[in-house]
């Protein structure tokens, strides 16, 4: 039986929490710092051991990064969507996932692209049991090839 590295679990928890914060921001109009503080307060009120504590640095980076670069991120995501799909047409949680994944691919080269894609697909599986994780995979793979072509084995 294998065990999960605690730092990996913390980063995974941070990605999941980031989606929740981004969703809250979109649904309530809360600003970035308020939404991050609300998330911290909710975690403090939860029983310990229920979930891995998130890597707060990564959580803050993702939420602040997506917030600060939303227009650019939406442009990248929009170009990666197929057909007549638009970022606005995506359901809010799905939109938060692809935005966060797109930000990480563009802003955190220390995370290998394939790891980044896999992590965000795992986050999608936490919310969806249908085709949505496949959409996340397709969009992020397209973005990885565009943003990190050499790493993905294809030219940009």
Swiss-Prot record:
Q: Does the keyword Transcription apply?
A: yes
Q: Which domain of life is it from?
A: Bacteria
Q: Name the GO terms of the biological process aspect.
A: DNA-templated transcription termination; transcription antitermination
Q: Which family does it belong to?
A: Belongs to the NusB family.
Signal sequence extent: none
What do the Gene Ontology cellular component annotations say? cytosol
Q: Which Pfam families match?
A: NusB
Q: Which NCBIfam families match?
A: nusB
What is the species of this protein? Paramagnetospirillum magneticum (strain ATCC 700264 / AMB-1) (Magnetospirillum magneticum)
- Report keywords, A-Z: RNA-binding, Transcription, Transcription antitermination, Transcription regulation
A GO molecular-function term, please? RNA binding
The reply on keyword Ribonucleoprotein is no
For this protein, the record's SUPFAM superfamilies field holds: NusB-like
Relate the protein's function as given in its record.
Answer: Involved in transcription antitermination. Required for transcription of ribosomal RNA (rRNA) genes. Binds specifically to the boxA antiterminator sequence of the ribosomal RNA (rrn) operons.
Q: Where are the transmembrane segments?
A: none
Q: What is this protein called?
A: Transcription antitermination protein NusB
